[in-house]
Amino acid sequence: MNGLALAYLGDAYYELEIRKYLITQGIRNVGKLHTEKVRLASNEAQASIMNYFLSLEILSEEEIDAYKKGRNKSHNSRKQMDMVTYQQATGFESLIGYLSIIDEQRAKDLINLGITFIKQGGYNG
């Protein structure tokens, strides 16, 4: 599977899961929903989550391969972020896209672990 195509899917899947999480937390103000969604789904947050997963050594070889497929693809980063952060975030999205196809529960479990990491101060955005 193409890494950038997986990242495309993973980006949408991750954002949907973040939005569902925020709604279930009782946030009703649209401005607050948007602010929290941006904080949890930013490239910087995704890169932090990915680094956290790697530090825990909880990913299988197949999952690491899916991450690398997205991370190693040639693409242009946005001006306001560095290339390493962009590559890590794209790799994270590729991993989530891959898992959303082959093991949706694992994708959700990792997303929930990432949310917990961010909420406990792993990334303050």
From Swiss-Prot:
It is an enzyme of class 3 (hydrolase). It holds the Pfam family Ribonuclease_3. Disulfide bonds: none annotated. Belongs to the MrnC RNase family. This is Mini-ribonuclease 3. Involved in correct processing of both the 5' and 3' ends of 23S rRNA precursor. Processes 30S rRNA precursor transcript even in absence of ribonuclease 3 (Rnc); Rnc processes 30S rRNA into smaller rRNA precursors. GO terms for molecular function: ribonuclease III activity; rRNA binding.
